[in-house]
């Protein structure tokens, strides 16, 4: 089914005609396949949450694998069928302490061990309805009692379980009941829901007798609902595939280098490879990666394409590129979805996510079918489009978008939707066994973003504040945690210290705290408040990361004194090498393409991101000539911290001389806000006639846009910004909107104990502590900032690299080859 992963490192470098593509005999999409049903079976397996449910075993997933001899056109899991057709009522995200996967498995075994000797577990059942084949495994069947059981494990009070959850459980056991009646030719059967409390180990059994005819009617009703949807999806996928196979490049010609990029992406997905593509800013990377991936989708049987970005502007560029494609092919039936953060999509941030609090959660699942259908008939679902559909049907835009992610063809989202430990898109892909392609935009950001995803921290000051207001039932647990916390840093004299291992006694106290808080929330759901709940989630995250701790993490304690006798500390589990977590997510996709203007040196990214050994690398030729960009190294000025005061006047005069020689719009980048302010103050004193505007700390999106709006075709002035911030990458100011950049820093990270510890670890792991911690990330930011200047074939501009270290050979060799220094 999959194309072989043969080596193609050399092949990817060699240009091919992107419109003369190798053909593959079979083409299969989830929900659709344009080949006879006898050749391939489509697996439909939907989950209503972002996580793989512990109740679905690996054995069950294997049982749902396509059977080449099966004549059914659709294969669906029992649970997936019921989640699609039987969910009703409110969206309710109130705290419910669920058992872990291990606890759930243990609970099932305990229940089974209590049954009679003839009791059967994991009973495989299957049946058909028209073109559907339904499969699953019932938890248990007792032939002596003629009783089929569905076992559900839980914590806390069973009465707290929402009614719509139990309704879904009954739907599952009824479908299993009909499949059993059909398989054993039974006229009736006892169906039982067995709720097992994993703490008390008590069972609550809810039993009802059903006739086979009643169960058959129920089964057929739900299958008919699902089949209608599945046939609609088949029609959509067939039309989409045909249109994508005929898709033409939306412009009259490729830019220089853009064709090489597109060909390489196509070959990477055709051979099931990971591709790292370094391509200069302005080449058209977004459309140069999206187009070939869409073109390859039919032959490579891709279910979805994920376009992942680090920042909001990246999502906009992807939407713009898809708009160009859609405009050039107006008949193209392509469902495009933009996923945004919950706080940006929430219509009622002051309300809780449940039907008693939020009107858009009330009856969410009752209105979901109509909202889902409406969303998919208006296939352009950016944030505004999704909001419009959701509000028209009175459902939550954020959770509707998560549902539509199951049916979209292209999903544009932040990195964390795929790479985070609980990422929605990765979880859905694994559960549904989707065949996906992943495009990672501005991939130079992946190292730092991934480190953040797989790190966790706790602040003792938050614990202290919590102890002042926590309920009596939690005081003893919190006091014990605080004692263990104090013991951790009691002997630490330095403000910062790293440790080789995680603290065992502290983690034990932390786990007891998790258990106690979970039990309290379950007994007192009305007691949930921002501080208590936030601390609970922070603790859970810390415990989870602690379980992953190895040599690729650093555990450190940062102390701060409140008085001569009292101090607080902050504990941090810092991931420094995310390769262990990134690599499985890259290899799980049919193809992962990471692209950026700055992916050098290769070994830096290969080491830290865990790239597969057969990853293909390309360095795309710049579409711009050396004459377009005048790059000057100003080596007479040092911007080192010790020389900062002396650098102010020379930098101001340099900016003024360039502005007077060629008036226009410029960006000036500095290493910090303080440095920026010092230069700006002197600039305004010395040259008040030169307009300037500054980046401020914590700017909102509207404020950032206001900063950029100052750069017009008619304006003149200098925008001051911090290197590595919002304006150092991902912004597009073509033509006269920006004609030059001054970069008064090498971009090196701040010298502090944390970075020095990182440097030590990088030296141990890779033998290049300074380079991996300071030099490579710093120069990367410089090149990104310089890339803002030349955006088109007609642009002309200047970049001034202000620091004597830019003249060093080790630094110069990291700069783009096409620059004329």
Language-model features and meaning:
Residues 25-30, 34-146:
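Metal-dependent nuclease catalytic cores that hydrolyze phosphodiester bonds in DNA/RNA
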Residues 125-217:
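Mg2+/Mn2+-dependent nuclease catalytic core
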Residues 236-278:
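Conserved pre-motif I regulatory segment
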Residues 241-242, 248, 301-411, 416-419, ...:
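A substrate-engagement module of RecA-like helicase motors
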Residues 271-292:
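Walker A/P-loop
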Residues 386-411, 422-429, 521-638, 646-647, ...:
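A contiguous, basic/glycine-rich beta-loop/short-helix subdomain that forms a polymer-engagement track
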Residues 393-410, 415-516, 597-611, 750-752:
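Signature of the SF2 helicase/ATPase Hel1-core->accessory helical subdomain module
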Residues 635-646, 696-805:
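Conserved RecA-like P-loop NTPase helicase motor core
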């Amino acid at each position: 089914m999959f194309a072989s992963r043969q080596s193609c490192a050399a092949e990817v470098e060699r240009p091919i005609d992107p419109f003369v593509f190798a053909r593959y005999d079979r083409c299969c999409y989830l929900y659709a396949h344009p080949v006879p049903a006898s050749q391939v079976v489509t697996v439909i397996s939907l989950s209503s949450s972002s996580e793989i449910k512990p109740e679905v075993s690996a054995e069950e997933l294997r049982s749902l694998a396509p059977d080449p001899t099966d004549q059914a056109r659709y294969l669906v899991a029992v649970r997936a069928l019921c989640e699609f057709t039987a969910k009703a009522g409110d969206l309710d995200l109130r705290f419910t302490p669920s058992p872990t996967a291990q606890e759930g498995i243990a609970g099932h075994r305990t229940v089974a061990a209590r049954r009679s000797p003839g009791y059967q577990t994991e009973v495989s059942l299957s049946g058909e309805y028209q073109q559907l084949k339904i499969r699953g495994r019932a938890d248990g069947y007792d032939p002596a009692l003629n009783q089929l059981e569905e076992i559900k494990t839980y914590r806390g009070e069973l009465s707290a379980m929402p009614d719509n959850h139990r309704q879904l459980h009954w739907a599952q056991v009824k479908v299993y009941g009909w499949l059993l009646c059909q398989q054993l030719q039974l006229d009736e059967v006892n169906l039982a829901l067995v709720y097992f409390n994993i703490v008390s180990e008590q069972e609550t059994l809810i039993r009802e007798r059903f006739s086979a005819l009643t169960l058959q009617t129920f089964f057929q009703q739900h299958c008919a609902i699902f089949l209608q949807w599945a046939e609609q999806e088949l029609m959509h996928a067939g039309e989409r595939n045909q249109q994508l196979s005929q898709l033409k490049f939306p412009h009259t010609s490729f830019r220089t280098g853009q064709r090489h990029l597109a060909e390489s992406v196509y070959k990477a997905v055709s051979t099931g490879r990971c591709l790292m593509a370094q391509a200069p800013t302005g080449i058209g990377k977004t459309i140069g990666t999206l187009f070939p991936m869409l073109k390859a989708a039919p032959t490579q049987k891709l279910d979805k394409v994920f376009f992942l970005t680090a920042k909001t502007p990246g999502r906009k560029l992807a939407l713009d590129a898809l708009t160009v494609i859609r405009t050039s092919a107006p008949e193209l039936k392509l469902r495009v979805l933009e996923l945004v953060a919950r706080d940006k999509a929430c219509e009622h941030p002051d309300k809780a996510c449940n039907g008693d609090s939020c009107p858009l959660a009330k009856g969410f699942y009752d209105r979901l079918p109509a909202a889902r259908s409406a969303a998919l008939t208006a296939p352009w679902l950016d944030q505004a489009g999704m909001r419009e559909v959701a509000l028209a049907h009175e459902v939550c835009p954020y959770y509707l978008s998560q549902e539509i992610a199951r049916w979209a063809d292209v999903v544009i989202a932040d990195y964390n939707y795929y790479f985070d430990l609980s990422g929605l898109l990765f979880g859905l892909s694994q559960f549904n066994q989707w065949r996906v392609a992943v495009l990672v935009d501005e991939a130079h950001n992946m190292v730092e973003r991934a480190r953040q995803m797989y790190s966790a921290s706790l602040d003792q000051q938050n614990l202290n504040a919590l102890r002042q207001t926590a309920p009596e039932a939690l005081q003893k647990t919190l006091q014990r945690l605080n004692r263990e916390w104090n013991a951790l840093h009691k002997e630490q004299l330095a403000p910062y210290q790293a440790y080789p291992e995680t603290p065992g006694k502290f983690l034990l106290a932390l786990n007891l705290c998790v258990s106690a808080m979970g039990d309290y929330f379950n007994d007192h759901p009305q007691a949930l408040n921002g501080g208590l709940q936030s601390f609970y989630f922070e603790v859970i995250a810390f415990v989870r990361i602690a379980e992953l701790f190895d040599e690729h993490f650093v555990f450190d304690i940062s102390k701060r004194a409140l008085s001569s006798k009292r101090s607080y500390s902050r504990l941090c589990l810092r991931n420094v090498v995310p390769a262990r977590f990134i690599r499985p997510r890259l290899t799980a996709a049919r193809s992962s393409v990471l692209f950026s203007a700055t992916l050098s040196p290769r070994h830096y990214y290969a080491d830290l991101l865990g790239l597969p050994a057969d990853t293909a690398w390309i360095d795309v030729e710049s579409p711009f000539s050396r004459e377009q960009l005048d790059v000057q190294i100003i080596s007479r000025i040092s911007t080192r911290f010790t020389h900062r005061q002396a650098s102010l006047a020379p930098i101001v005069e340099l900016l003024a001389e360039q502005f007077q020689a060629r008036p226009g719009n410029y960006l000036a980048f500095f290493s910090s806000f303080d440095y920026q302010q010092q230069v700006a103050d002197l600039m305004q004193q010395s040259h008040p006639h030169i307009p300037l505007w500054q980046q401020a700390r914590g700017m909102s999106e509207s404020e950032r846009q206001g900063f950029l709006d100052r750069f017009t075709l008619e304006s003149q002035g200098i925008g001051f910004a911090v290197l590595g911030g919002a304006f150092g990458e991902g912004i597009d100011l073509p033509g006269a909107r920006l004609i030059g950049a001054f970069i008064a820093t090498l971009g090196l990270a701040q010298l502090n104990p944390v970075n020095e510890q990182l440097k030590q670890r990088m030296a141990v792991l890779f033998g290049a502590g300074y380079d991996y911690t300071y030099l490579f990330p710093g120069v990367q930011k410089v090149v990104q900032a310089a890339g803002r200047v030349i955006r088109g074939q007609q642009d002309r501009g200047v970049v001034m690299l202000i620091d004597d270290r830019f003249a060093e050979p080790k630094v110069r060799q990291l700069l783009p080859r096409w620059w004329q220094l």
